[in-house]
């Protein structure tokens, strides 16, 4: 097979040599067709690829990509002899917009060379380059092109090199601290060694200088003296007059101001020698820092397992907030004066990351701004009056970048990352700037709390034009346990405008909104921010504290509503990029709203398997506005809570036992069989959806005190044996810093024989009903089911105290479904039914007639009949059944839902094409006004005017005997 492949590829090389002169416009398509044939296809069309595919521009109009083969590759052709490095930005822009099912790889080709990119893992340099003449023997990097693709083999895959290099320095650091070297000295020594390793491979030190020095460190004393002397010389503005270190230049007085001297063991010297064997010019500073930082204290985790934020995810902030507005201005500049003004602006353009970690956002922001600066110079060169030797001496400096973080070591890493960024930009862009001395960034990076100053007031932030970053992902319920009550009191005192139940990151959003300058006609580049937050920033208190305020003073121009985040395990995030203005002249008319979709199935692998890809796909639509829910739909975020929905209570979370021993399999019933009044059937959420029933029973003492509970000796002894020790242990382990048992642990211990949350109020309501409604609390699509009144629901279920078919119809309709999706909170990627935001604000029909009520009832009964008939012949339960709704084509289930939706619209008085959210929001507002006036309104359930409401309750239910 390999020989056959080689023959086809050799024939392609010979054909190109004989027939192609390298004309991009005239020969690209025939070249690409032959290229596909060389890899075993019948041609690019037969493989499913498209030439000249339309790609939307950032503003108006379209570009045309030379070839797109989803989900495999985008190919951009350039004329023979063209410098492919100049076309990276164009290729990345095309790739970004080719959603959904975006190609995994990108190829830039000038008929003689193939530059291969994998932007998911490595952005600014190719993962490999293959010359045309090498193709028969070096097709490994292009192995994804074959009809039966194999894993490509890349020669410049910098992520793996970076992880391996980081691993060596992590082991060095752990070895030093493990044997008692002061932690601060060990950190400083490691960072200074890191700079030396980079320096000898990127031309700041003589090649192999540090490696040869390590060869001579044959004793701990020599290691102390030789390496220490190198660091001392790197801090000296005066070169050594002679000797071994006379070639060492001055680096700066920041990183090396305190040269670290350590007597290294032979094993530690070996770690450094192994590290020196890597080509550090291929180590990526923007991911090295994060990997290194996250590995330092994780004894069970080496660098290869650490998470980092992928550069392509960082560009989802840096691109819209920094690159796009600058790129538009640069390309639209029409005079030399325009370009000179842009140059002056960009050289004074300042960026802040107030939760910078090891500096990866700032590194990529700096790199992209240097590219923009280079593009300004390139365009200035188009004017004959410009003498390149007379260019101004000013340039974008790393001193324009500011960072804050509570972790001192992360700040030191960030400084090193930014120091390296300058030299790497010089090499990448071939610009004439002095690499040394490195900028001293001590004044730019601050160690400490970014939110609170020592006196409890808001921390002062540096004055900048733009703010970027990803603040800590910490949910509201974890703030007190993780940060302490005292800290949270001071934080809420300093930020009274942020609600108490807002996630931690919301404080950064609100602080950024208040700190940013206004975006104006003269300062169009300022007043911009892009932050990553928990996906909950779109919802409830978090939304009120952050995005509501942002939308009140500015405009969200690009957002991602929900995606997995590459930087943390099992975290789903939302991203908002905004401008602090509502002036139509300063914001784009078309805003970009990205949203997660189900991965499109294909015979080809759509995404990489690395952690940065996390198996998801995004799509994008251009919209006229993005609201504080990060949606372009009617904004229901400000809907009012309706008192008629709250009192009396209609909806509850199911029972939370709090310990597995309270839930009994059928086989364990015998141990307490003589005390049946404490036991009831118990239902968990998965049983409803999967159709698989594992009979469980709940042991529940209810509200009985300990003396009453002892009247049931078997059950009491069982709980005393199985539950009490666990609650005693939890109380002990959960003490606060003052040694006090936390309130919830104290409550559980004081009533250890009772369920954690027995929901007595819910059980009282359900005891009056023959059946009740439930749906899963965490669900993409609420599927409502009646449950027999004898069964007690578990905490994975949202419970609704309705037994009638009319209420079922309203809740199962598209009206409630759309309201749910607009108002729910989220757990990871799945929506969560939050009664306070969804049910308590949902307006029920006010003028339903007996005829429209009956129509809803009959349609709801019919829907359940269709479901029941289908389930009799389908494995997998309701979950499997409802997956068929997403498939194309007609089905009885779709028809039944359409019938129900039409009936519910008529009950509301909505037209068939009326926007449901708009109609419901208007009704919500009218009901709030009516309630405030003291008028009688129709709350949840059967309309009060309906005669003989008992006729609206059928008998089918889950668990019915």
Regions found by a protein language model. Give the residues of each.
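Conserved residues in the N-terminal Rossmann fold of short-chain dehydrogenase/reductase
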Residues: 108, 398, 403, 442, ...
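Non-catalytic DNA-recognition/assembly elements of restriction-modification systems
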Residues: 356, 711-722, 839-961
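A short, conserved, highly charged catalytic patch centered on acidic carboxylates
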Residues: 1-105, 119-123, 147-148, 152-157, ...
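Polybasic, glycine- and aromatic-enriched phosphate-binding surface used to engage nucleic acids
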Residues: 79, 96, 506, 593-858, ...
